[in-house]
Amino acid sequence: MGAKTPWIQLQKLLNWWVRDQDWNQHVDQLHMLQQKSIWESPLLRAAKENDMCTLKKLQHDQNCDFRQRGALGETALHVAALYDNLDAAIMLMEAAPYLVTESTLCEPFVGQTALHIAVMNQNVNLVRALLARGASASARATGSAFHRSSHNLIYYGEHPLSFAACVGSEEIVRLLIEHGADIRAQDSLGNTVLHILVLQPNKTFACQMYNLLLSYDGGDHLKSLELVPNNQGLTPFKLAGVEGNTVMFQHLMQKRKRIQWSFGPLTSSLYDLTEIDSWGEELSFLELVVSSKKKEARQILEQTPVKELVSLKWKKYGQPYFCLLGALYIFYMVCFTTCCVYRPLKFRDANRTHVRDNTIMEQKSLQEAYVTYQDKIRLVGELVTVIGAVIILLLEIPDIFRVGASRYFGQTVLGGPFHVIIITYASLVLLTMAMRLTNVNGEVVPMSMALVLGWCSVMYFARGFQMLGPFTIMIQKMIFGDLLRFCWLMAMVILGFASAFYIIFQTEDPDNLGEFSDYPTAMFSTFELFLTIIDGPANYRVDLPFMYSVTYATFAIIATLLMLNLFIAMMGDTHWRVAQERDELWRAQVVATTVMLERKMPRFLWPRSGICGCEYGLGDRWFLRVEHHQEQNPYRVLRYVEAFKSSDKEEVQEQLSEKQPSGTETGTLARGSVVLQTPPLSRTTSLSSNSHRGWEILRRNTLGHLNLGLDPGEGDGEEIYQF
């Protein structure tokens, strides 16, 4: 029985993998079976085709079972609702009222009622009929088709209300709420209808429905619907930040903004920092945004007031503390390096036992290591090093459990690789200390590795500077992206050609060609050849095997000409991609660093930013005042442009009238008319003059920019928001 267990587990794993791979095929088969069952059943087919005559006959047929279901566990009422057959649905409800509350029984549509289908199809009349006959407005569909998954093209939640809100039917939303639909209902992920609206691609309808649903959120509950979190602890506002939904974020910020005053082009506004400010919050909005897997989330950092809040925190507290921390770390590494350079060594007592043995000094024992005055000074540095390593671990380990190992080490913006490096460094320092205390030889191994890792961690502090911050991200992406892929290819090539070289020289005298005398040496020599560190290690004073020339020529072409240049091209492409996002990435680094410092620093060294509303009668909330400089209204500029155009027409007409024949003027004078020359409103300069030509270019450029920038729906302000 025990021998069969591994095979059973393997079979389950294979079945799960095959089922996951063939999900689409499985769904296709279900739908084909559904159509087949509908065609074979007279009741289901009549419901599909809206055949009232057949339905009336079946209604009076004693053998007809209105509870019969199709391949997916759907009833005839489900079929009628699916094909928008109102008459058939009403007849079925009259013949079998219990069908109104029946739900689908089979995956992937478990729990789906006819009301769900009618709402999705926006059949208002059918929705009214179902609600009038007792359909539950809070019915829940729990099948896999209603989950947020890569297999599903849409995610509308599990309740009819969320369906109606996502399809944008305001009338159905009002109907459902009037018939008792719970606007606070949550699906299996804990998402309310507001969460689900944030996830919709049609952001205009989502914002409109968001406002409509909030208007029904009464004061019966202590917590607003907007503050209800899902299973991940995300409110709709935080979810908008994680998803990078800038439209919804701006919409919600407009609801929180309070305009203080306007003075010409200047406007002063107060922004509510609830859920935005990371001060004192366990699940920080800023940290969620920078750690999001979606690139669109970084655009949230450009929005007001997030941009201003981060800039305030970074310039006032973050940058000075970060620079101070970097200086302390460099001093710490200098101390550690000095202790390693002057580590306790003594001359070796034993004689050499092998001709290749080149060791002349060895490590002192613990009793001999701390005797002289210089040893005691070194001991102080070693204590500083060990205490620093312990502090590093105490600061890093709690964050691993708080954030999660995969996210903490995997997010580049959060400094993931540097966390691995610094934790490994601290562990190696403690290992070196343990080896020193126990008189175990070989401390040079962890000590040398710790030196390399410790100094590499200095690059982490480059993120405090705009010029160097993206540079570190570029190095990380090249190492963990391009270099890892290249190393796999390089390993395969080296393994193959090293084996070939070893076989070719297996019958030759190793004294004349020792680079391939044994297999490990052949592997290392091939690695050096691959990186062009050495030339072809051949002794041309003796006859070489013919296959060596062929193999070496092939290796040189593949390794040097092809693969190394391919690697350079890959790194160039990575450099170009990172360069396109350098400012965005650096800003995300600054936000992540600011949040990290704010969480670590004592409260008396990092006070809360913003304005407390309690002091000004604004409640127990914090605000940030932002002044906006409004751009000139393009419509006002357009008036001046039109004035320029009209003045030009007057000039042209005037010059044309001056060029008319003199007979016209004499005829006019003969009639006794007196023509008075009035000065034009604009400057009367020649069209061919340089000044007028420059004025013309300036005016046309202004017109061109206005034509590109004008929009009939735009207003005067800097921040324009409309639906």
Swiss-Prot record:
Q: Provide a GO CC annotation, any one.
A: apical plasma membrane
**Which coarse location class describes where this protein primarily resides?**
membrane
Listed Polar residues bias regions: 654-667
Sites of the modification Phosphoserine?
S682
Q: Which residues carry this modification: Phosphothreonine?
A: T678
Classify the protein's membrane topology as the record does. Answer: Multi-pass membrane protein
Instruction: Write out the GO MF terms.
Output: calcium channel activity; calmodulin binding; metal ion binding
Q: Where is this region: Disordered?
A: 651-673
This chain belongs to the protein called: Transient receptor potential cation channel subfamily V member 5
The scientific name of the source species is Mus musculus (Mouse)
Q: What is the lineage of its organism?
A: Eukaryota, Metazoa, Chordata, Craniata, Vertebrata
